[in-house]
Amino acid sequence: MVTMENSDEIMQILERFTDLKQKEIPKELEEYLQYVAKTGDTIFKWSSLKYLFREKLLSVIKHFNEDSPRLEEIPNYPNVDPFNYETMKSSLLERLDLFNAAPFTVQRLCELLIDPRKQYSRIDKFMRALEKNILVVSTIDPGRKRTESENGDSLDSVVNGDLSMEVNIDIEMENNNGNADEGSSPGAGSAGCAQKASCPRSDDNDQPKAKKAKLEIDGEERSEASDETDTEVATRVKNEKDEKNDNDETDSPHEAAEIEEPDEEVDEADQETKTTKQPAYGSQKEGEQEESFPSSADDEAEDPMVSKSIEAEKELVAQEKKREEDKKVAIEPKEEIVKKEEVVESDKPDGKVAQLGDKAVVKKSTPPADGENQEPVKVKAENEKEEKKHAPIKTEKQDDIDSTETDDAPSAEKPAEEKIASSESKPKTKSEDDPEAETKKSQPEKTETEAAEKSVSDEKQAAEPNAESENRNDLTTSKATEAAQESVEKSPVEDASSPAVEDLAAATTPQSPLGAADSAAETPPAETGDDSQASPLVAAVTPPVLALNDQPMEDTPAEEEARVSPSATVEEVVMAESANAGAMATEEAAKDDPAAMEIDDTSQEVMMQ
């Protein structure tokens, strides 16, 4: 085992070798190189060692090249530059001269120089290994001690220089410096440690808080509830809910409002049909189908609302309903009116009656050439503004009228009297709203009062002798009135709609004077009495079958006037407001069936003539 107990003697020998530029390396210096290969400690400065390493390198390469196979036998590799002994030797020597201190690979260099053939048999590989260890930049200072194992091998040595030793040195230096600082000023050292410990802790605590705040702004507010007071959480939740409500209500305020009201109205219609207990299976099925669509749409509209479970949302939706009640009517499609008229026609029982109804609709659809229907349309458009207020009262009166249809004949006069009383209680407000109607209808007052007196007497005469024919036609009248009632309950808002919808309904079902005369000529007295009993203000929904009664047609003009009688009696009570009272008397008729509007038109047209 090589020891450096005689380091002074080796230093003298090294200086003599460097000064004399000797070519042969003495034995003591060979032992020194073995020591460096074992420990990695150069002991001496690099300036005194440079010549020794240079001469040792040249001698080893020379002997290795002489003993190795010829250079011509060395194969050429595509990924490696061709080997040239002279150029590589000169480059290694130049690079070795550039070091100002011992390279950190000095231990590996010494190993290669001591025993060159231990790991390499070809000169090219050996010289490339030397090149790897010389083409470095890092250097080390002398005086470093290395640990040795029991068998003499260095534990810190590596194949291509000791890189781990460099790291260990840095750690030891830091530890030594820290120990020195602590020894010199223990109080200051402890304070510095406390500051170092406190700073990263504060940073670590601040960063998670910032991240937590970002996450909670996105949507997880419950985790923050323990830190904040209840009032702050409540205000924040309300603000976010208001923003969500604004976004949701701008998208579907009209849909929710339009869907919910028909659902409630259809529910009321089902309750009223249960009280009447009349068999109308086709109309009930259609009512259920129409009920299913808005109810399902209503559920779809309310599902996100329920999932959020927000009370403020419901309040805002209720306020939106109140604000947009006036706008709902204009938004509803006009096609529903035509569909419901077709539903009423499809519910008629007999095939002949349906055919006659189709003919009557064709006749009614032809507008009059003289333009006489324009005035009734204007009067209706002005009167429809107040129909919204009185719609619930009139639906209750219609229920009373339907319940009295199955009673005896004398009960037919009661609905007419109730309607006359209701129309008498309302004329003043309507006359104020409709000054134009008063100016238009001021001329034919005398003829209207005369027709009204005749119509009351004819109505009483027609109702008494026809009690027997009433029992036969209960089924037809009950079905027709029930279908009309469903149409009223499904679209009360539609009948009391804006003037644009009103004009569409009036244009689809106007009745010319000729059509009114034809329908009057086809009705026998008994059937007309029955229809007047069923609905005094409404003419027969369908022209009756002639086979039921074969009585002579003597009183058809008087019975035609009987259809006009409700409006005429109202005009008799209030002379100055005849047009408005007549229109209000026919409001229920307009809701019951499209034919009601037609009768109002024909009554006013006959009076004008």
Curated annotation (Swiss-Prot):
Residues 175-569 are annotated as: Disordered. Keywords: Phosphoprotein. The modification Phosphoserine is found at S68, S223, S226, S252, S603. The modification Phosphothreonine is found at T602. GO terms for biological process: mitotic cell cycle; negative regulation of peptidoglycan recognition protein signaling pathway; negative regulation of smoothened signaling pathway. One of its GO terms (molecular function) is protein phosphatase regulator activity. GO terms for cellular component: chromosome, centromeric region; cytoplasm; nucleus; protein phosphatase 4 complex. Serine/threonine-protein phosphatase 4 (PP4) occurs in different assemblies of the catalytic and one or more regulatory subunits. Probably part of a PP4 PPP4C-PPP4R2-PPP4R3 complex containing Pp4-19C, PPP4R2r and flfl. This is Serine/threonine-protein phosphatase 4 regulatory subunit 2. It comes from Drosophila melanogaster (Fruit fly). The lineage of its organism: Eukaryota, Metazoa, Ecdysozoa, Arthropoda, Hexapoda.
